[in-house]
Amino acid sequence: MAIYLTELDSTFNFPSPYEALSDPNGLLAFGGDLDPHRILSGYYQGIFPWYGPGEPILWWSPSPRAVFDPLTFKPSKSLKKFQRKHQYKVTINQATEHVIQLCSSTRPADETWLNEEMQAAYIQLSNLGHCHSVEVWHDNTLVGGLYGISVGQLFCGESMFSLKDNASKIALWYLCTHLASKHGQLIDCQVMNPHLASLGAFELDRDEFIQKLLSLREKQTASDTFTPQVLQDSES
């Protein structure tokens, strides 16, 4: 069966997310490039790049959409107990490039979409103030973290990694707590999976997600939300 997709041109325009295919879920367009301004334009419309080895750049806007509500996120009792015992240090925006690299290198080469071109694009977005990371440290070594794109009061999570037990879960927990205190309203996780569901993610259909996106992208978090800072000191 033939699939007809829009090919992106030199402008940063995208087709409507409502034109995305249902199978494969959310596939919307192909081509273009990974210019940071194009990527950011996509996020502001609920569209993100994802493609595998040997494929053109593919752009997606799936439905339903997996999300977290920072205001209602609750870490499990076992996770809180783990953190009390191990006291991982948690920071924000102190090692974004390293986090992006580890999100790629900690996965088998044939299982990651985060190739060198994608890494470079998100590092550029970090330099422009749009891509942010949460880092988890143990004995001054980076052992877990996540990164994503800020779109007003929406945070679009991209990837996470964990080199020690629960490190990525702790990154998510502290991100939620931090965003909740800084007027952050929603975390987009793109597509649901069992791991996200176990942490409390829930789904929004396309209409509801786009409505929230259109509202939240026009609002701002506190001015110091993504200032490099310590969220949890290892000795606190």
From Swiss-Prot:
Q: What is its EC number?
A: 2.3.2.6
**Reaction catalysed by this chain?**
N-terminal L-lysyl-[protein] + L-leucyl-tRNA(Leu) = N-terminal L-leucyl-L-lysyl-[protein] + tRNA(Leu) + H(+); N-terminal L-arginyl-[protein] + L-leucyl-tRNA(Leu) = N-terminal L-leucyl-L-arginyl-[protein] + tRNA(Leu) + H(+); L-phenylalanyl-tRNA(Phe) + an N-terminal L-alpha-aminoacyl-[protein] = an N-terminal L-phenylalanyl-L-alpha-aminoacyl-[protein] + tRNA(Phe)
Q: Please tell me the species this chain comes from.
A: Vibrio parahaemolyticus serotype O3:K6 (strain RIMD 2210633)
A Gene Ontology biological process in which this protein takes part is: protein catabolic process
**EC class of this enzyme?**
transferase
| Keyword check for Acyltransferase | yes
Which keywords does this Swiss-Prot/TrEMBL entry list? Acyltransferase, Cytoplasm, Transferase
- What's this protein's name? Leucyl/phenylalanyl-tRNA--protein transferase
Q: Which family does it belong to?
A: Belongs to the L/F-transferase family.
Q: Which GO terms describe its cellular component?
A: cytoplasm
Subcellular location as annotated = Cytoplasm
* Primary site of residence: cytoplasm
Q: Which domain of life is it from?
A: Bacteria
**UniProt-recorded Gene Ontology molecular function terms:** leucyl-tRNA--protein transferase activity
Under the heading Gene3D superfamilies, the entry gives: Leucyl/phenylalanyl-tRNA-protein transferase, C-terminal domain (3.40.630.70), Leucyl/phenylalanyl-tRNA-protein transferase, N-terminal domain (3.30.70.3550)
Instruction: Tell me which HAMAP family the record gives.
Output: Leu_Phe_trans
